[in-house]
A protein has these predicted regions:
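Sec/Tat signal peptide C-region and signal peptidase I cleavage site
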Residues: 27-31
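Bacterial N-terminal signal peptides
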Residues: 13-26
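Bacterial N-terminal signal peptides that target proteins for export
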Residues: 2-15
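Non-catalytic structural scaffold of enzyme domains
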Residues: 32-260
Length: 260
């Protein structure tokens, strides 16, 4: 098991981010008035194409039966700094925590972190979420549990190298949580993603073909890859798990008032 420890400087930055959150993290997508009977949730993006936001928020609305207020937070610098450094640094952690703090102040009942590259940071904040009464869940957490329940040999597919390690660790944590041994392999399939969807899904299937032969199940590390899931599943004859549906389900389950 990997232990994630942050030095004192990190927590000083975290405290500063909580104090300055309203200045750092303006909310978009929030209703001016909120019906207390309608759940309010927050979504934190660090890479946010219009298609990704539409897919994530559509999945959330479907999970909640359309009755949900969604607060949206975006900060591309968190992803950029983390991907470049290969780890979560003080500044990116403080910015992320600032978004969480503003979501809590704004009345969110639970927070969904969409970026797989910062999955370790979202995981490390579970204790904060418990104390604050505003749980935070990573979009891949429940998907990784489903992968572990479905097979021992799990293949992680990603288009960004920075998404691989955190997703692998999420799977290993899920294995430990469920008491199951797992074997994780990875394939990074870059090139052309987002330009020609049809061409890319074929490229993705071919890049995964060899590794998929020895895998029980395939996990897409990034929710932005979800449109390719059906094609890859059909081409390779392997079950493919993709978000945002698992993240939406976990977000609803995390709400204190959900009773789940």
């Amino acid at each position: 098991m990997t232990s994630w420890k942050f030095h004192a400087g990190f927590w000083r930055a975290a405290a500063l981010s909580f104090a300055c959150a309203p200045l750092l993290c303006p909310v978009s997508g929030a209703a001016a008035e909120h019906d207390a009977a309608i759940p309010k949730v927050a979504v934190i993006y660090t890479v946010a194409t219009p298609e990704l936001k539409e897919g994530v928020e559509r999945a959330i609305r479907e999970e909640f039966g359309g009755k949900v207020d969604i607060l949206r937070y975006e900060d591309a610098a968190v992803f950029g700094e983390t991907a470049k450094a290969g780890k979560v640094g003080r500044e990116s952690a403080a910015r992320f925590l600032g978004m969480y703090a503003d979501a809590a102040r704004s009345g969110a009942g639970a927070v969904l972190s969409v970026c797989s590259t910062v999955a370790d940071l979202a995981y490390s904040m579970r204790g904060v979420g418990e104390l604050a009464g505003v749980p935070i869940v990573g979009i891949n957490d429940e998907m990784c549990r489903e992968a572990v329940r479905s097979g021992k040999r799990i293949l992680v597919a990603a288009t960004f190298p920075s998404a691989v390690g955190p997703t692998r660790r999420s799977i290993l944590r899920a294995g430990a949580e469920l008491g199951r041994e797992v074997e994780v392999s990875e394939v990074v399939a870059g090139g052309g993603f987002g330009s020609d969807a049809g061409a890319f899904e074929k490229l993705l299937a071919e890049k995964l073909r060899g590794a998929a032969k020895s895998a029980d199940i395939i996990v897409f590390a990034q929710a932005s890859m979800e449109p390719c899931a059906g094609f890859v599943e059909g081409a390779l004859g392997k079950r493919v798990l993709a978000n945002p549906k698992f993240g939406a389900k976990a977000l609803k389950s995390a709400l204190p008032e959900s009773g789940e």
